[in-house]
Every structure is written in C-alpha cells, then in structure tokens.
Regions:
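Gly/Ala-rich beta-loop-alpha elbow adjacent to hydrolase catalytic centers
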Residues: 3-8, 12
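Helix-loop "lid/cap" segments that line or gate small-molecule binding pockets
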Residues: 66-76
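Hydrophobic residues on the short alpha-helix immediately C-terminal to a glycine-rich phosphate/catalytic loop
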Residues: 15, 159-162
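Flexible "cap/lid" loop of the alpha/beta hydrolase fold
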Residues: 17-66, 93-97, 122, 130
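Short, proline-enriched alpha-helix->beta-strand connector loops that line the catalytic pocket
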Residues: 106-111, 133-136
Length: 166
C-alpha cells in the first residue's frame, strides 16, 4: 500500500502500478490522470482559490515563503510547530512540476482519499474532483494541508481502514 500527501500523490499514482502495490491512500494530494502533472493540475485554479506562496526557484528548487507558511500550509498547527516546519522544508525540484504520469495506478487499484476541507495549497474542490475521478473512497475532515500534523488520528484511521480493507 502506498500513501501519498500533496506531491506524494503523484509519486504514488505512478509507482503504484508496481505489482506489489495493491492499494493507494491520498492525503490532501494530487491524483493525476494519464499525461497530467502538477503543472497541468494547477494551471486553472478555481476562481477565488488561494494562491500557494511558492517562491521563485532557487538553484532549481522551490520553497514556500516562510513568512506565509503558517497561514497557507499549516493554519491549524500551533505557531511554534509551523515555524519549525517552515524552517525544515525539503526543497522541491522545479522539474517535478512537469513530471507527467504515464499510467495512473488508481485506475486499477482500490484507493482512499482524505480531503482536507481547510486546505489552502490544493483547493478542496480540486481534491474532491480528483478523488471522484479516481473512484476513491472519500473521507473529509476539517484541516489544513498539514492535516497529518493537526489531525494525525484522522489520517491514521484512514490508513488503517485502507490497510485492513479486503
């Protein structure tokens, strides 16, 4: 079973076609279809959708603006923990934006999707649309993009449900 959060959903979608993978779990994640990438999924945001505070590339990598991290990524996480998360960001390669999925695993694998209803990075309507298209079993919970930090019990329960499903 693969579990992906955010961009990790792209990785799970592509890698999940491996025969040893039997299930997928998306946590406020991108779930692209064939030939889609993060770039194609974010090119036409819904009207009024928040714009993620991604800084211009630095040496081929992307980061979120630390000053806006708490409000945009982890609004339901206490300020001290959110500041630590902002400081500990892992750089994201610019090339990852355009990496298109060749064969989406969700077409042939059962999958679950947790929609974070207060997410300001991937709009909840976009999450719902990707989950519906993937035929996912959907759970919704109030939470930011960092729902795995603010609501770990909800995330763990969904993973447990998927892991024990027939």
């Amino acid at each position: 079973m693969l579990v992906g959060h955010s961009y990790g959903g792209v990785v799970a979608t592509e890698a999940g076609t491996d025969p040893t993978v039997t299930k997928l779990v998306y946590i406020a994640a991108f779930a692209p279809d064939r030939a889609e990438s993060v770039a194609t999924l974010i090119q036409n945001p819904p009207p009024g959708a928040p714009v993620p505070p991604i800084l211009p590339p630095q040496d081929g990598f992307l980061f979120l603006d630390k000053a806006k991290f708490h409000a945009s990524f982890a609004a339901d996480v206490d300020a001290e923990k959110a500041a630590f998360m902002a400081d500990a960001q892992v750089p994201w390669g610019v090339g990852a934006l355009d990496g298109a999925v060749t064969e989406p695993a969700w077409r042939t694998r059962p999958n679950w999707y947790l929609v974070a209803t207060d997410d300001k990075m991937i709009p909840p309507p976009a999450q719902r649309a990707m989950a519906e298209r993937a035929g996912a079993t959907v759970t919704e919970a109030e939470g930011s993009h960092a729902i795995y930090v603010s609501k770990p019990d909800v995330v763990a329960a969904l993973i447990r449900t998927a892991a024990t499903a027939a």
